[in-house]
Amino acid sequence: MGKITFYEDRSFQGRHYECSTDHSNLQPYFSRCNSVRVDSGCWMLYEQPNFAGCQYFLRRGDYPDYQQWMGFSDSVRSCHLIPHSTSHRIRIYEREDYRGQMVEITDDCSHLQDRFHFSDFHSFHVMEGYWVLYEMPNYRGRQYLLRPGEYRRYHDWGAMNARVGSLRRIMDFY
């Protein structure tokens, strides 16, 4: 079971809302979110209702302002508690629809292009575990949650292009 608390003001001040499950619409509970405390679990926050818009991965810890979770604004409108998984396996492909070169990964990779020499990554097949995909190397830039399943093209994981710089397993205990 996870637990996350959203605060309207920075440094855990102002009106707050405690949550322990997925929420598709947080708007009734607070108008803005400037700080977050994650007591347990791993969470994906979304700027828009219904798990849409920019995504932000948070694990246990304190985030006194939205820049701490690489947020672009104080807008958090939905959240998803990420299930715990013990094993991780993902296949990445050079082209859409699982074409081109394929590489299977079971660990984090801070710089995909250096490691595999592809210029773009157009499709993914998540066999086991949950992953966070980052737009830039060293776990920076826009973030995307990858759940077990198939992602035939970058639109399937919510991206505007096939630029992928790094990939990290979600491995936090409750």
From Swiss-Prot:
GO terms for biological process: eye development. PROSITE patterns: CRYSTALLIN_BETA_GAMMA. Keywords: Eye lens protein, Repeat. Residues 2-40, 41-83, 88-128, 129-171 form the Beta/gamma crystallin 'Greek key' domain. Residues 84-87 are annotated as: Connecting peptide. One of its GO terms (molecular function) is structural constituent of eye lens. It comes from the Eukaryota. Crystallins are the dominant structural components of the vertebrate eye lens. Belongs to the beta/gamma-crystallin family. There are six different gamma crystallins identified in mouse lens. Has a two-domain beta-structure, folded into four very similar Greek key motifs. This is Gamma-crystallin F. It comes from Mus musculus.
